[in-house]
Amino acid sequence: MASSDKAFTLDIVTPQKLFFSGEINSVIAPGLNGLFQVLKGHAPLLAALKSGKVRLSLSDRSEDTFQIAGGFFEVSGNKAILLTEEVS
């Protein structure tokens, strides 16, 4: 399954590089007030992030997890951008 009707685009960007760019079904991120999940069709959102784990559900049904050092998360249309100082 290369892409699905549930998928949307996510970019994870650091000052050094584009760390990830791809189609995902969902993302769970560490907001300042707790974890939040974003799916395709989410309302526009701008959220501050604290350090923690980001979990992606990829469009091929696999999962990936990254550790971030805080940052910001934006959703607009069917595209999301996660900006962070550091990711591993």
UniProtKB/Swiss-Prot annotation:
Q: Which InterPro entries match?
A: ATP_synth_F1_dsu/esu, ATP_synth_F1_dsu/esu_N, ATPsynth_dsu/esu_N
* A Pfam match: ATP-synt_DE_N
Q: Does the keyword section mention Disulfide bond?
A: no
Q: Which GO terms describe its cellular component?
A: plasma membrane; proton-transporting ATP synthase complex
GO molecular-function terms, A-Z? proton-transporting ATP synthase activity, rotational mechanism
Bilayer topology? Peripheral membrane protein
**What are the entry keywords?**
ATP synthesis, Cell inner membrane, Cell membrane, CF(1), Hydrogen ion transport, Ion transport, Membrane, Transport
Where, subcellularly, is it found?
A: Cell inner membrane
SUPFAM superfamilies, A to Z: Epsilon subunit of F1F0-ATP synthase N-terminal domain
Function in brief? Produces ATP from ADP in the presence of a proton gradient across the membrane.
Its assembly, as annotated, is:
F-type ATPases have 2 components, CF(1) - the catalytic core - and CF(0) - the membrane proton channel. CF(1) has five subunits: alpha(3), beta(3), gamma(1), delta(1), epsilon(1). CF(0) has three main subunits: a, b and c.
Q: Which family does it belong to?
A: Belongs to the ATPase epsilon chain family.
Which protein, by its recorded name, is this? Answer: ATP synthase epsilon chain
Native organism: Chlorobaculum tepidum (strain ATCC 49652 / DSM 12025 / NBRC 103806 / TLS)
Instruction: Give the taxonomic lineage as stored in the record.
Output: Bacteria, Pseudomonadati, Chlorobiota, Chlorobiia, Chlorobiales
In the UniProt record, the gene name given for this protein reads atpC
